[in-house]
Amino acid sequence: MNIQQVIAITGAGSGIGLELVRSFKAAGYCVSALVRNEEQEAGLRSEFKDAIEIVAGDVCDHATNEKLVNKAVARFGHLDCFIGNAGIWDYMLGVDEPWEKLSGSFEEIFDINVKSYFSGISAALPELKKTNGSVVVTASVSSYAAGGGGSCYIASKHAVLGMVKALAYELAPHIRVNGVAPGGTVTSLAGPASAGFDKTKMKDMPGIDDMIKGLTPLGFAARPEDVVAPYLLLASREQGKFITGTVIGIDGGMALGRK
């Protein structure tokens, strides 16, 4: 049990992020969660009551990330781990799209999938330095291979892989930095507004389970609860203390190619 450990999680209102809140809370962590809007805040409040801290706001806004950290420290006294998990998909957006659509989508995707992680880490860093804490970010099987999205999404997830390596080197020996790379996981992941996908949810795509199953050697599409275990390992001071600069794949073998 990690009763005294305090963790801040972005993208915590749905999908993998929501499952992370549940899993870390069950493991004894104190949790501060950043969600997108009041609807998600109400959902977490209904489930967790006052057991966790909740911030609703734009993950790309640095003041919002600072608020997430400050609320964690104000209530629980310190911060041990920051998890950057917010993200959007591009719904296979191609480079042959009109430039205005492509450029806007690129900016949205990189703002959320990459820049928001830097913002959250920057906000958390002063507190993590006090505790010799750690960072975990959500990468993807698309951090290693093509085919898991369009070029904007794949480029953003390759950037996350580079971020993990660079920051692990920069912040050692006092702060560990790692990532988790899920494969095909059915969630409510939305897309860029510039491409008209901001109201679209991956889980509602016709045939999404069969599509992921066909790409995954283990033969099934994951759900959020199937991919949270590596986050718990990497955040743990005891079990993860000798791990940094590592991205753990949990993709059903998708990175190996089709069977």
Curated annotation (Swiss-Prot):
Question: Catalytic residues per the record?
Answer: Y153 (proton acceptor)
List of residues binding substrate: S140
Which residues make up the binding site for NAD(+)?
A: 8-35, 58, 157
Q: Which reaction does it catalyse?
A: (1R,2S)-1,2-dihydronaphthalene-1,2-diol + NAD(+) = naphthalene-1,2-diol + NADH + H(+)
Of which family is this protein a member? Belongs to the short-chain dehydrogenases/reductases (SDR) family.
Taxonomy, superkingdom: Bacteria
The family database entries (Pfam families) matched by this protein are listed as: adh_short
Under Enzyme Commission nomenclature, its number is 1.3.1.29
Q: Which UniProt keywords apply?
A: Aromatic hydrocarbons catabolism, NAD, Oxidoreductase, Plasmid
GO MF, one term, reads: oxidoreductase activity, acting on NAD(P)H, oxygen as acceptor
- CDD domains per record: BphB-like_SDR_c (cd05348)
Q: In which pathway does it act?
A: Aromatic compound metabolism; naphthalene degradation
* Name under which the protein is recorded: 1,2-dihydroxy-1,2-dihydronaphthalene dehydrogenase
> Would you kindly state one Gene Ontology biological process term found in this protein's UniProt entry?
catabolic process
Q: What does this protein do?
A: Catalyzes the oxidation of naphthalene dihydrodiol into 1,2-dihydroxynaphthalene.
